[in-house]
């Protein structure tokens, strides 16, 4: 994933010295105490790792692949990438999957979450041209994983859209719903006999606002509070359309599960004043709930607070309709319940308070939400300036999901720590251990968490940060001819947890 979070949040996150919070002790230690009766993960709990196609595959113009939005963006705007790099070669996983497989086997993971490149398999976005070489490649990957008792978990869209679709406005045009429907049908038909876990979209909240609101990701549209909301609306409908397709056409004989990966922090207040819990709930609904509430909530629509605020603000701005229209009865029926599991990408947390007056452009998500987000300067920070070690947040967001969404089954689809790429990565081990402890605590408290995926298997291209921030359990020698993968100390630690099913 990863660097994307900062692009949304850097505009309105402040630092604060919150040294006497009722939630956290002072100090920067990255740890969490064990709670509950069980000290081991259940036998049916699955451990894995994640990657994404554009970030690791390389081979950007080989074997019939079409251009993606990220190919075009990095080639036309190298100055927007911190080290002027791109994903043209990346880890060369398209040609070096055997090296990735060696790492997966060393880790003894139960599953591998990877994404299929839409422009690689369908260069023109629809099914008129199907790239057989790409199909053969992904068939090879899936078959080799299964031969080694590693379950494939496939993400359909991890931010690399066929460039062809940007001509129509990308996710601002509802035609993308139909295109994604065809793409999903193709994937289910081609790979669904072996792939039983599907993630339609990865972190739509995180790509919609930077790409269509703040103009810092392709296609660099600056229309906050309008185009980014269209993106999120069309993504939600595309997801639900694909889900209903699977249930109607494939589910009975393929027996798979379909869900979405939603990113979120957990939010806290540093006060016990009346109304503080409302602020926490508001922050959660304006981020996580934007997608989770329509799918897993009772209403089958966006959170009421979000609908009410944006409608009111739109009227104040002189508009005849809301910038975020509630889902129609037709779409509400399709969207509600369109998830067999909930994918959660969690990295860090924030403190939240109401911003008076509201901040941000008019219109914008920042202005509509009226939230001011803060971090505690005593928290341990990663290489990424948005990433702090707050394991309690993972435990608490899992409990929040349990209570809000009828204890839906949760797959933790991403969770990770960045540094400069050092092999002796003690901080990553601390982060990993404390967050796995949070998962175990949540399981002990009745949360239905069944999968955990660390981000990432190997160091990779981190979007606008290039290769300046590394999340991998394996170091990637980007400049070498063979793109060697070298195990960091954290890889050994993670393997020990997987083998023993307990935290050491």
Describe the function of each predicted region.
Residues 1-3, 140:
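Ordered, helix-dominated protein-protein interaction surfaces in large eukaryotic regulatory proteins
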Residues 110-117, 151-155:
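Short, well-structured secondary-structure segments
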Residues 44-46, 94, 111:
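A common structural microfeature
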Residues 82-96:
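Active-site mouth loops of central-metabolism enzymes
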Residues 50-52, 115-119:
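Acidic/polar N-terminal loop/beta-strand segments that form early-domain functional surfaces
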Residues 18-81, 105-106, 124-126, 132-504:
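Active-site region of glycoside hydrolase catalytic domains
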Residues 3-21:
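Cleavable N-terminal signal peptides of Sec/SRP-targeted secreted and luminal proteins
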């Amino acid at each position: 994933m990863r660097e994307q979070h900062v692009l949304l949040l850097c505009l309105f996150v402040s630092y604060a010295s919150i040294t006497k919070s009722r939630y956290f002790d002072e100090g920067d230690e990255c740890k969490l105490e064990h709670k509950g009766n069980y000290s081991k993960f259940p036998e049916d709990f699955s451990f894995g790792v994640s990657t994404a196609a554009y970030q690791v595959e390389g081979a950007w113009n080989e074997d019939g692949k079409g251009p993606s939005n990220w190919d075009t963006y990095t080639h036309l705007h190298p100055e927007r990438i911190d080290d002027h790099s791109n994903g043209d070669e990346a880890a060369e996983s398209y040609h070096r999957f055997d090296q990735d497989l060696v790492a997966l086997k060393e880790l003894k993971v139960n599953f591998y979450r990877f994404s299929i490149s839409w422009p690689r398999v369908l260069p023109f976005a629809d099914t008129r041209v199907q790239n057989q070489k790409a199909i053969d490649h992904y068939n090879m990957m899936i078959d080799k994983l299964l031969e080694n008792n590693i379950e494939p978990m496939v993400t359909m869209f991890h931010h690399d859209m066929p460039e062809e679709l940007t001509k129509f406005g990308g996710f601002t045009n509802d035609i993308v719903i139909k295109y994604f429907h065809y793409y999903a049908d193709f994937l289910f038909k081609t790979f669904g006999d072996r792939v039983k876990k599907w993630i339609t979209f990865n972190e739509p909240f995180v790509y919609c606002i930077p790409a269509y609101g703040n103009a810092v990701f392709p296609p660099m549209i600056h229309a906050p509070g309008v185009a980014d909301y269209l993106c999120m609306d069309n993504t939600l409908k595309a997801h639900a359309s694909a889900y209903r397709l699977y249930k109607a056409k494939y589910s009975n004989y393929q027996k798979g599960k379909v869900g979405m990966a939603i990113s979120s922090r957990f939010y806290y207040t540093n006060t016990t004043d009346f109304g503080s819990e409302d602020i926490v709930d508001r922050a959660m609904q304006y981020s996580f709930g934007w997608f989770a509430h329509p799918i897993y909530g009772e209403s089958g629509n966006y959170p009421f607070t979000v609908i009410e605020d944006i409608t009111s603000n739109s009227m104040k701005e002189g508009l005849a309709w809301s910038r975020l229209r509630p889902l129609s009865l037709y779409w509400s029926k399709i969207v509600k319940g369109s998830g067999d599991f909930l994918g959660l990408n969690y990295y860090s947390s924030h403190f939240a308070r109401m911003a008076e007056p509201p901040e941000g452009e008019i219109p914008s998500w920042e202005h509509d939400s009226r939230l001011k987000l803060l971090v505690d300067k005593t928290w341990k920070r990663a290489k990424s300036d948005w990433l702090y070690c707050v394991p309690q947040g993972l435990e608490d967001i899992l409990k929040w999901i349990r209570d809000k969404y009828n204890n839906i089954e949760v797959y933790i689809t991403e969770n990770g720590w960045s540094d400069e790429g050092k092999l002796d990565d003690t901080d990553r081990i601390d982060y990993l251990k404390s967050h796995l402890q949070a998962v175990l605590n949540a399981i002990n408290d009745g949360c239905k968490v069944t999968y955990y995926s660390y981000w990432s298997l190997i160091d990779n291209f981190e979007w606008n940060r290039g290769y300046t921030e590394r999340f991998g359990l394996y170091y990637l020698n980007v400049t070498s001819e063979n793109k060697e993968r070298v195990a960091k100390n954290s890889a050994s630690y993670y393997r020990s947890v997987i083998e023993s099913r307990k935290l050491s």
